[in-house]
Amino acid sequence: NEADLPFRWGHLLTGPIAIEGAMPGDVLEVRIDAVEPLADWGFNAVEPFDGTLPHDFIMSYRVLSHIGVDRASRTARLPWGTTLPLNPFFGVMGVAPPPEYGEISSREPRKHGGNLDNRRLVAGTTVFFPVWAEGALFTCGDGHGLQGDGEVCVTALEMALEGRFTFVLHKAGSVAERTLPRAESPSHLISMGFDADLDEALRIAVREMISMVCERSTLGRTEA
């Protein structure tokens, strides 16, 4: 029998994973130890009336592209023959949202993380999440074989990935307070901002970067 349930848009995710001792106000450090492809294919989809340019590509059907993946050479071959290097990462990573958010989908990124779609969050990078609920409840998924600076057509190279993570819990007061996810690679600091207004999201990300630079140096906000 078919259940009469409301449709909830969302991603394929693994979790939630409870972190022992995590409480609101703590910071969860997530070390991305490894991200590996699990399949020899992926796909990209262009949806009708969706994405960054919904009125530039007017069609009544979905354009679905099968993309072959060579795991040995870590490359993907597009249908027209272009070969690109893989850069696998999980599009969705986050913890449980603040209770006042209520029930939400995985589509919008907010201060708990979520649908970050940040191609720089690859193996070797560490992400810091503010904890909003007991146990933190880490979740990840939405595997991407590679992606540009965002999903202008709403998808990247969507594919199955396997990840390995190390979790480090920082109790409240032991590190600087966090209100947004931020990340560090071996060579870069990575700030993020989330808002329905892209200009405001940019301002938030710049303020976050200023704070990150100041915390790691003797510079003041103006110099940073």
Model-inferred region functions:
Residues 193-222:
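Extended, compositionally biased non-globular segments
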Residues 27-30, 129:
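A generic structural signal for residues embedded in beta-strands
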Residues 34-123, 128:
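Intrinsically disordered, low-complexity linker/loop segments enriched in Gly/Pro
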